[in-house]
């Protein structure tokens, strides 16, 4: 049976399309993907992303443990702020892309992908058990995925909405910085973050989930429903719209962001395979802090020394056509790779995509061809984002 978020019943009643995604039954759109997409680029929309995974790491050894199981330097950001970091397997392949918040008092919260939290829970606990063979750890790992509600408010008008709701200016926060706030007595964490390329904020708080896998922990989501409706009501003057996962995907693709399972992945195998993706291949080495030990580091160093045969590149269509995952990519008649994500940009009105290609072609300005329905269609590689960052995005010119 598919998993469900706290206010699934509201989505089922109000969304035009609800279907399974990564094991969760989720709203795909309410009005249309294009309508919700443009609401984020030009105004504001709210997403229920309570299907994302959350873990709490607590104890004197929490920081050292997280430094070992993730790639970035978790020790730098002060409380309360987050770090974008990766979890790798021993072969250097990406198990997931995560966000880790330093909550203070030896406590950290990790946010991970919806289809990764179960395997990460098993992974972290296995590592913890292995370390404890050499001595006890002061560390508790708690999976809060089914308990935590998470709403993402995105778009240029999100700043105004945050001022109205919480009396804070999110532009005073750096990216991934967070604050503890209240809404009608409901305490929550607010972070300046998102997955759309636009300015925005996300709120986290615990509530009962009527679809919790443990029957004894089920209950009515009074807080989640109240917060959701309150944000929608407060955002009416800004034209707020509820948005589904369809728009979330087209928005992240326009921004040039990777998606686990498409651009980053690991095989559930015990042998190296080219279908596994490392941070070096996915252009995610900005999330690696090399001056520490972490799982997968040795494999990455070897790969860096050997050379990287293929890398991610972004491209836009010149000819008419919509690229899709798995479509073949050519240059000068030579097969050089395949598409990992593709769509028709609701903002630009053209086909855009991301592909894995031979490294020599992974740079802007290269003319390529994408095989669409058996026919080669012209395209050109570009640097992300696909939109003009002076007109759109979190750092657009006012």
Curated annotation (Swiss-Prot):
Q: Does the keyword Transferase apply?
A: yes
Give the InterPro entries listed for this entry: GCS_T, GCS_T_bac, GCST_C, GCV_T_N, GcvT/YgfZ/DmdA, GcvT/YgfZ_C, TrmE/GcvT_dom1
Recite the UniProt keywords alphabetically: Aminotransferase, Transferase
Per the record, GO CC terms? glycine cleavage complex
The record's Gene Ontology biological-process terms are: glycine decarboxylation via glycine cleavage system
Catalyzed reactions:
N(6)-[(R)-S(8)-aminomethyldihydrolipoyl]-L-lysyl-[protein] + (6S)-5,6,7,8-tetrahydrofolate = N(6)-[(R)-dihydrolipoyl]-L-lysyl-[protein] + (6R)-5,10-methylene-5,6,7,8-tetrahydrofolate + NH4(+)
Q: What is its EC number?
A: 2.1.2.10
Q: Which residues form the signal peptide?
A: none
Q: Could you say which enzyme class this protein belongs to?
A: transferase
> According to the lineage, what is the superkingdom?
Archaea
Q: Name one GO molecular function term.
A: aminomethyltransferase activity
Q: Does the keyword Cell membrane apply?
A: no
State the HAMAP family in the record: GcvT
The entry's family comment says: Belongs to the GcvT family.
Q: How does it assemble?
A: The glycine cleavage system is composed of four proteins: P, T, L and H.
What does the function comment of this entry state?
The glycine cleavage system catalyzes the degradation of glycine.
Protein name per Swiss-Prot or TrEMBL: Probable aminomethyltransferase
Which lineage?
Answer: Archaea, Methanobacteriati, Methanobacteriota, Thermococci, Thermococcales
